From Swiss-Prot:
Organism placement in taxonomy: Bacteria, Pseudomonadati, Pseudomonadota, Gammaproteobacteria, Pseudomonadales
GO biological process: glycogen biosynthetic process
Enzyme class: transferase
PANTHER family: GLYCOGEN SYNTHASE, GRANULE-BOUND STARCH SYNTHASE 1, CHLOROPLASTIC/AMYLOPLASTIC
Pathway in which this enzyme or protein is active: Glycan biosynthesis; glycogen biosynthesis
Molecular function in Gene Ontology: alpha-1,4-glucan glucosyltransferase (ADP-glucose donor) activity; alpha-1,4-glucan glucosyltransferase (UDP-glucose donor) activity
Protein source organism: Pseudomonas savastanoi pv. phaseolicola (strain 1448A / Race 6)
UniProt name for this protein: Glycogen synthase
Keyword Signal in record: no
Amino acid sequence: MSQVSRRKVLFVTSELADLVKTGGLGDVSAALPRAMRHLHDVRVLIPGYPQVINSGNPIHIISQLGGHAALPPCKVGRMDMKDGLVIYVLICPELYEREGTPYADSDGRDWSDNHIRFARLGLAAAEFAAGEVKSQWCPELVHAHDWPAGLAPAYMRWRGQSTPSIFTIHNLAYQGTVSTASSRELGIPDEAITPEGMEFYGKLSFIKAGMAFASHITTVSATYAREITTPEFGCGLEGFLQSKANKGQLSGIPNGIDESWDAATDEHLICHFAPNEWTRKEINADYVRELFELDASTGPLYAVVSRLVYQKGLDLTIGVAEHIVNNGGQIAIIGRGEPEEEDAMRELAARFPGRIGVRIGFNETDARRMFAGSDFLLMPSRYEPCGLSQMYAQRFGSLPVARNTGGLADTIEDGVTGFLFKESTIESYTEALNRTFQVFAHRELLNAMRCRAMAAPFNWHQAVEPYADLYRDLLKKNVSISSNY
């Protein structure tokens, strides 16, 4: 990594695992700023959801911001986390203080004004970068994450700001599209509603706005960065992304996982263990079997820890479940998501009582215990930008069985730390599962693979170094541009 000077960086995100999260975005938004802090002064801007306002962390109001078009006025508060991370909270009760998730109500219906809610977040980031927030701290670079923050680089560009920006794609399939009729209420200039701007098949796309107007685009694995330039994974944006890649404006930087994922120290586990302490790992397995009402067994235990959505390939797991059970295996499933996927999981468990168990919902403690207690993690994703679960599992000696795509391809060494299969078919998946049966029957090989998996270097240093280099390059270019005025 090249030498860098300490600069001010604002992360813009809709989730932060400390306070509110629905998936990997929240984990990354919490971990990466902390990993970067020894190099830069990194702070985070997030909406003031009830989970944030009521977190027990004091919030001190530092500024008021006016409205713009249909975007209402709001306040900015500062929250200092116990470890020193500074969080700026965008306080606007009419937009954010609602029961449910950051994106949907308690029944899972998307908020009808999400375009207003997250446009306000993007505008606040631009106002921050322009020095309009009354604070002694002003970012020199803005790093926006996924579609909810997509308008941050866009508003910065439309307002004529020279502050460089990065837009990170965590999942291209979630694009934040809205009717072009909303352009006036969002204050979007007509010249931005073009194929080169944020127009996408007759609609406005927040994720495309981020990609179009940011100084640089990243995504969360090298393989996914290549995949999204192809029709199979590009979600209709492959041509646009290929043009960015051709200009050197698209790169893949892998996520890491934090140091709490350590089987020897994790406070959530029933029993700590180190490599080769497999009888202690079995104590965690016994807990998982009891939690999911599975029969006592010495056969392989497979875990599913996932959002229950089509992307995750859960229909494939349903298709191979009987094969797993017939070979002496059991499956424990935890997650929440689309109602039809949740119902399918319940029906699967009902078909195989004592062999397959499901818990709809998500609990961090139980998820960690599942990684620690299982022998294998099932992850047949149709696509996976990065994925974190396969890294969590390996750290706890659970070998992932995953499709060879995106970040899964980059973080699993086939036959060494896990099992990869190529096609998104039951046949290809079954071939990989047959290999798990063979390995499980040969304990010396199983334990050797577990040891290699637990030693895999999934830390944030792998992401910090390339991001630090990218920050330096963008800030250097910005100085050169500014000096020409």
